[in-house]
Amino acid sequence: PIAETDDAGTVHDRLMAIGAALVVETVDRIIDHDGHVETTEQESLTTDTAPLRDAPKIFRDTCHIDWCQPTERVYNFIRGLAPYPAAWTEILSADGRRMALKVFRSERIAEPHALSPGAIRTDGRRHLDVATEDGFLRLLDVQPAGKRRMTADQFLNGTDVSACCMA
């Protein structure tokens, strides 16, 4: 099962290990049965009657975070794109400057508010919370454009976001 804190990277790594073990098991069965292995039609493994579709190509704009969505949806959007290609947003300063920010990890805060989606709530040192439609997301791991990945408190040590919002 996929845990609440898993992201695409952790699921990928787990499936990679399962796949490697399955390859070894399959080769062992082929050897044990003189090259004969019972096959299974792939169609028999699905129970849904809807046709399968190809996954859409992911572009940079596809990865942009829409803070007007419910907290759960934004949280899952970030998890689904982490660690690569990574969800991103822009920090809009009071003077109109924009800074791209990739978001790798966050946590949900179920707290009603009257703030606009994308509004930033911070203590300036450790917590970087962004308002969503129905709560907040606390950003935990981020990467400013042109810099390395860092924790939110490391980011806040060098960046004043008190008069900023997310775009």
Annotate each language-model stretch with its function.
Residues 1-109:
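Active-site-proximal loop/hinge segments within enzyme catalytic domains
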Residues 62-167:
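An anion-binding loop in the catalytic cleft
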